[in-house]
Amino acid sequence: SLTNPPGGGIAPTGGYIVGRKELVELCAYRLNAPGLGKELGCTLETPRDMYLGFYYAPGVVCEAIKTAIYAQCLLELVGKKPIPRYCEDHNDIVTCFDAGTAEALIGFCQGIQAASPVDSYAAPEPSPEPGYTDEVIMASGSFTQGSTIELSCDGPLREPYTCYLQGGLNFAASRAGVLLAVQNAYFKD
């Protein structure tokens, strides 16, 4: 969602606990300290990074939306039907599209990884993942592991080979990633 990345790609930790009040309280006691709960939590000596993340978050979300719109335009040019389309309202940073073949999905994800600032040398391969019935491929060369605001993509290896693309800390680098991914998926020869 557009309110998802309050850390702006800078905060080294974060997360959400949701549920019934008494269960959230139990989680807070378990994750922080008994008796302190959510009132006083661990900050890992990083409040500066968290505040800076809050400060940068609106701009980072704009970069991710620009990346999504750019990707949607480019995908339409190569005959794909992204959801949402570039001309539609955006209430999320995720773009999904049917890659068409397993090779195209793998190529797209490998292109995103190759253009990433971290672990660009790695070539993701489909593998079994807990909770999925099919193999899944994931690409994310992120500064913060598990970050959803940094450029990443993934998808299950089954027809119609739907790819989920999201994020982008800055448009310039993300545009290069999307270009390389499309080239790798559809213009490899």
Give residue spans per PLM region.
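Active-site C-terminal subdomain of aminotransferase-like
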Residues: 3-104, 185-189
